């Protein structure tokens, strides 16, 4: 029988970038931290995430092979409507994201740092936009465990 913790680990490993060298750094509540060579990331699925193929929404904070540090990105459950704003709310703080298709991200490194700081102390974050069909698209992520997962990923990539 699969317990909640193992289900989260299995789900996040599927949502994370594919590679044979992937290493789980830990699961921290609903957030996981992973390493794949010189890439590291903290990642979570939204509450009530769909398990259907093609609808694997997630939020991640990553460190990459091209020098990215604490880069925030989101995969939406569906493609967003062209021209629709993408808003991220962390408790009472509001951030404007940019993106296209089913992806959204912070505008620059400064915005990444502000979002990560808010995630560290926040309780919940919600990303909202309009889907291509005009329907409201909203994903909510509990932030319990996010700071620890972010730290685990940052430390793992600092060692490379």
Question: Could you describe each region identified by the protein language model?
Answer:
Residues 1-8:
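Bacterial N-terminal signal peptides that target proteins for export
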Residues 11-20:
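Hydrophobic h-region of N-terminal signal peptides that target proteins for export
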Residues 19-160:
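A generic "folded-domain core" signal
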């Amino acid at each position: 029988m699969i317990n909640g913790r193992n289900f989260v680990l299995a789900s996040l490993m599927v949502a994370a970038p594919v590679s044979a060298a992937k290493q789980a750094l830990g699961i921290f509540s609903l957030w996981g931290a992973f390493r794949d060579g010189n890439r590291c990331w903290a990642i979570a699925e939204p509450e009530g995430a769909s398990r259907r193929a093609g609808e694997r929404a997630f939020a991640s904070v990553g460190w990459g092979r091209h020098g990215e540090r604490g880069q925030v990105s989101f995969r939406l459950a569906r493609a967003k409507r062209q021209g629709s704003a993408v808003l991220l709310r962390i408790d009472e703080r509001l951030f404007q994201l940019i993106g296209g298709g089913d992806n959204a991200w912070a505008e620059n490194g400064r915005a990444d740092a502000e979002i990560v700081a808010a995630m560290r102390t926040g309780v919940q974050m919600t990303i909202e936009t309009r889907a291509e069909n005009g329907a409201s698209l909203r994903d909510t992520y509990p932030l319990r465990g996010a700071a620890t997962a972010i730290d685990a990923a940052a430390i793992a990539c600092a060692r490379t």
